[in-house]
């Protein structure tokens, strides 16, 4: 067969007979098998070096899946990363670079679910990564964000705004450092640039127009609202960062030189006198000079590119304003078309009103940035020249704006047409919008242009006054705008009648009850600012507002009512009262004098219920009181001794009262003295005793209680005070000692003191231990050779001295609270016995041991032994040697029937050493008093 014939046989068609099946081919594939899918929920092989999630995937596995072509795999990898990093947070620091590079790369992914997972992961990671850690990688993050914001896909642009929200919240300083690129991106999100040849030579403000994208799922107005909200947040972060930078400029870092600071120097004179406080007067007076440098570390933008100035330069700010303001005006016109404008007073729907609010917020922030850089007011003039006409035409034509709410009626009457019901409400939207607009407009006005702008300024003034007087509840943001506009109006139009009207309107709002703390604080600061401005003027041009005087006069009463219910607000009131009192404001001082009894009440007054800092300011206010009557001094004394004031504040109060007394050395006439000498001495003695007359009277009925020490040899019982009360009383008494010591005529001073002791303390049967100790202390301080001690006082001192010594000798080791009193009380007892030998003799004469029970006899013996051993008393003990010898003899007689104890042996030994063994002998020293 030829080759040609063979080729033909290959292509011959096989003829099949009817009813017979087609024969199977030799290479036919069987298709009768069944298949099942294989699902691997986790890896079989585990990696022990890296932590894994519930699917046994570690960080490297998950990051590698980010490059997969399938969107579901990438989404699963992002969710797995979130799960893994939530279980093992330490992985973030180790793999931060890889995590950020992979996560930010999917900002522009075409799948919406992948982008959503990336945004959720970034929101989870951002709070866990510090700004210092993020800073090296932020150029990469910013580049991907910029790429997403300028992407041609609408969904990617929308998701980029979510990423921007996260970065603005967590890293405002880093994101605003890239402002040059991001601000341009904001512009491109809502507009496009005209590239026609006719616009080449025109300015840049006319080359950008709003863009409309019909393919976007949102309306053009909704999309612009989203972008404008983010732009407002971005400019707010930029303004905050710029203000912080300006505050820190030129100041030395505290870490570099802790001695150099711009704050006030607080000097504690007590510590300074003891060389415990170092005071550096001059900033560069230390060993480390202040090096003020303008050097700043720039961001790692790569290459040799310069620092991103953004809007920090005036030229850049002007350029951005020229581009964005026309676009914002277009947004405004789109929200409120002039051809469809309803009459003034009719409402605007919520969505257009929100667009208008964001437009004004952005303009207000741009104005704020311009004020931070406009030192010569050139930029302010430029803004007025270029934009005042447009603002008046578009913004003020329908001022003020209101919100229209659409209410749907029920279809009960189908024949009647359903009409929209317009509802006016004091909603935050329209009120804040009107206030922001007022703030922008008044910033463009000044005193020189008042005649030209009087029409729209009067509109704003009327709106501000009505808003303040209508009694509506304002939040702090609204009130801050409102007070800012009011202040600016008073500056540009310093008319007394108009200013008084505005102040009266603010005072009407201030008188409302139930205002929240931020609102009340803003009102206080506003009035304080007005008052300080008035005080800075010369007396010739000073205008005292009647409303302001009424406000000042009401502050002390407000403080008395407020008390501790709001300590922060009370502190602000005290600061304002202190400022006005220091300037001798008559109305305030008169009101403060009338309210002083309530403020300085020892039970519920502000001086005892507030924290330490406002307490100190209230104590300082005592210096400015016009008069200090006896009832007020009595309350101040109770404040000192009750422990509600610290001992240092009590000492400060005592020092202030001394400075306002006739003994301070100031040359006053008798009618100008704030308090009489009798009242001043009464205050000092009441503070010295530490207890009121009523409290001492109640103590006299105490018997047989653990806090009362009773002896068989002394008629005076000792009341044991708590340790805290004892120490506080002791510290306060030190200040009383100092005030008494500086009073001239020491003998007269001592006579007044011992007369008070004889009148109020002598005759009492129960005396507090702190009172007895302080009385001994003040007598020892004041006693000199010119002083004569009263005969009625000596027995009382002797009885108190024995009671104190008995208490000290019977303190058990377990009573740690009373052990801390031992040194102080022992010192004053020994001092009083050394200075007044007659007190020692009277105490020895009272030791009639035949009346003493067996439990008190060892205490008497121990007391005699200690008195003999104490060097300052040795001479006086020699003088009373016969009396001491008789007491020891009586003790020995009482103990003759039993075995001699150790304390009696020690007593005999000390008597033989210090009395019998003395060269002169006891018989030669027998002196009869």
Curated annotation (Swiss-Prot):
Major localisation: nucleus
Disulfide bonds: none
HEAT repeat residue intervals: 99-137
Domain of life per record: Eukaryota
Entry's localization field: Nucleus, Nucleolus; Nucleus, Nucleoplasm; Cytoplasm
Pfam families on file: Ipi1_N (PF12333)
Phosphothreonine found at: 29
Protein name, UniProt field: Testis-expressed protein 10
Recorded family membership: Belongs to the IPI1/TEX10 family.
